[in-house]
């Protein structure tokens, strides 16, 4: 054992559950750009409330959204504004924490910290504008991973719909 050297480690974790307990008159509150967030009794704070993307129709090349995210049997729509909204995730992680080490030798110390989180979702807001099918002309250029990587022919199974200038859908 060296009296000039010490090594200290610390570990912590926190389970968080931030739920909306009560709202005035028990009514949901939608807020944020496009009312994309939802406060609802019993749900997590910062719940994402959005139309749910189904995918690209391989025959038409149009993007499809579920008409009712909570009941897929009601079918799909191509127009984002006609799609029903549903809970598609939450921003808050379930668990957060950290792990640190400190090494000390005489009057010199070296420390590092590693943080982590599990759970929670992320909404790529800039990506909302750069991954489009022509509907947001003039707002931003297409993202590099969309350029050339979209529906071209019937039967194509792709992630990005056919680009249509000033897309009415």
Please annotate each region the language model reported.
Residues 1, 10, 52, 100-102:
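Outer-membrane beta-barrel architecture
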Residues 87-88, 97-100:
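Generic recognition of flexible, low-complexity loop/linker segments
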Residues 3-5, 12-17:
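Internal catalytic or translocation cores that form aromatic/hydrophobic pockets or channels
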Residues 5, 93-97:
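Residues that define the transmembrane beta-barrel architecture of outer-membrane proteins
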Residues 9-11, 112:
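Membrane-embedded beta-strand positions of outer-membrane beta-barrel proteins
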Residues 99-112:
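Conserved catalytic-core segments centered on acid/base and nucleophilic motifs
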């Amino acid at each position: 054992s060296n009296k000039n050297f010490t090594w200290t480690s610390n570990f912590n974790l926190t389970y968080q559950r931030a739920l909306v307990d009560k709202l005035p008159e028990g009514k949901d509150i939608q807020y944020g750009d496009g009312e994309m967030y939802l406060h609802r009794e019993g749900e997590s704070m910062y719940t994402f409330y959005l139309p749910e993307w189904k995918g690209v129709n391989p025959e038409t090349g149009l993007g499809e959204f579920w008409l009712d995210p909570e009941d897929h049997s009601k079918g799909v729509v191509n127009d984002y504004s006609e799609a029903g909204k549903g809970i598609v995730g939450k921003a808050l992680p379930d668990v957060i924490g950290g792990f640190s080490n400190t090494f000390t030798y005489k009057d010199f110390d070296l420390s590092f910290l590693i943080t982590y989180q599990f759970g929670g979702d992320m909404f790529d807001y800039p990506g909302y504008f750069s991954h489009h099918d022509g509907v947001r002309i003039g707002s931003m250029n297409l993202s590099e991973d969309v350029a050339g990587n979209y529906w071209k022919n019937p039967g194509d199974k792709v992630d990005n719909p056919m680009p249509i200038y000033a897309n009415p859908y």
